């Protein structure tokens, strides 16, 4: 008998095989490293000679946090990451080129090398990090660069809700009339239309139509949601006269902390600063409404075993995503090998 998949938490091994947003681009500077966490592991991220780099936040000498150090300039003019404890210095490839206590002619061990993240990249105004080779590519956000779209970002928050819970909630539509009654939910919505759910590779997509309350007016809108083997999800909302694109990016920092990035776009604002501010405020409110429920859960663990909960047809998209994450988790477990008692 196949063992039931373990619940998904913020430090589950599968998150090490995924891209995660870890900072706004302007938060990563060239003068000092920033400390970020992914799945319980700390990384030092900085820019060396216009190159974005991320290393395990430990100097191999005495395991001091590199993020406590700074960026210095070598004799050749190149930028170097420097440990604050004993001054060991590293180039953009993680190679140590100076140990002050040995002098400039000292013999530096090949082991004096930093461990890099598999990948670090910049997209949509965010810095993304993949600790190990990711199963899925960076999440797509086509509206971000679409002509006529006004781009903004919602307030970045830290929450005790897990990345899995946040994405699962983002994919769900049956909670709109209840959780979002004060924003866009329609109280007498009725049964949720079945829509369609498809899985292709490491991505699930759901398409359905639901009512949407825009101020005092209720209109029908088409919802297209996608999520993959990572802690991010995308939605495209098509309403009469307006298209909205949203990317929810979750950084699973530790077992009980997640940083939430929410990027938003719409094509009917133009240069109207007042309408843009109102749009951002509404999206902030929607996230706050979701967190008011999610943060009341006693645990951040998301069941991946379908037998752990009772599902209906309205849950098809989130169930498909959980199945995908269960498959991804199983693949990562096979690569790691079974636990040794």
Predicted regions and their residues:
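C-terminal catalytic domain of Rieske-type non-heme iron oxygenases
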Residues: 63, 135-341
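Short, acidic/polar N-cap/turn motifs at the starts of alpha helices
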Residues: 19, 31-35, 42-43, 117, ...
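Rieske [2Fe-2S] iron-sulfur-binding domain
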Residues: 2-8, 14, 21-146, 341
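A broad, low-specificity signal for short, low-complexity segments enriched in glycine/proline
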Residues: 1-8, 41-43, 80-91, 165-167, ...
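Short coil-to-beta-strand transition motifs
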Residues: 14-17, 243
């Amino acid at each position: 008998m196949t063992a039931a998949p373990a619940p998904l938490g913020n430090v589950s091994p599968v998150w090490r095989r995924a891209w995660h947003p870890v900072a706004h681009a302007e938060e990563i500077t060239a003068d000092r490293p920033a400390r970020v966490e992914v799945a319980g592991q700390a990384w030092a991220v900085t820019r060396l000679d216009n190159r974005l780099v991320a290393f395990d936040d430990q100097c191999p000498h005495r395991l001091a946090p590199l993020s406590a150090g700074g960026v210095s300039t070598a004799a050749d003019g190149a930028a170097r990451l420097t440990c604050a404890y004993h001054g060991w210095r590293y180039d953009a490839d993680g190679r140590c080129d100076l140990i002050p206590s040995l002098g400039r002619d000292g013999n530096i061990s090949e082991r004096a090398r930093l461990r890099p993240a598999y990948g670090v990249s910049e997209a949509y105004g965010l810095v993304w990090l993949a600790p190990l080779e990711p199963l899925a590519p960076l999440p797509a956000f086509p509206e971000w660069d679409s002509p006529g779209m006004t781009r903004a970002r919602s307030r970045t928050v830290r929450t005790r809700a897990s990345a899995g819970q946040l994405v699962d909630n983002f994919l769900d539509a049956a909670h709109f009339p209840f959780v979002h009654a004060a924003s866009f939910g329609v109280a007498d919505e009725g049964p949720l239309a079945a829509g369609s759910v498809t899985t292709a590779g490491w991505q699930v997509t759901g398409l359905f139509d639901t009512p949407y309350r825009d101020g005092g007016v209720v209109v029908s809108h088409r919802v297209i949601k996608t999520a993959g083997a990572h802690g991010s999800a995308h939605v495209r909302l098509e309403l009469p006269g307006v298209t909205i694109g949203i990317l929810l990016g979750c950084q699973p920092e530790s077992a009980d902390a997640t940083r939430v990035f929410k990027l938003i776009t719409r094509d009917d604002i133009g240069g109207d600063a007042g309408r843009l501010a109102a749009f951002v405020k509404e999206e902030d409110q929607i996230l706050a409404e979701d967190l008011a429920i999610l943060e009341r859960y006693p645990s951040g663990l998301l069941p991946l075993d379908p037998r752990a909960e009772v599902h209906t047809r309205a849950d098809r998209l989130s169930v498909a995503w959980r199945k995908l994450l269960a498959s991804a988790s199983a693949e990562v477990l096979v690569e790691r090998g079974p636990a040794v008692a």
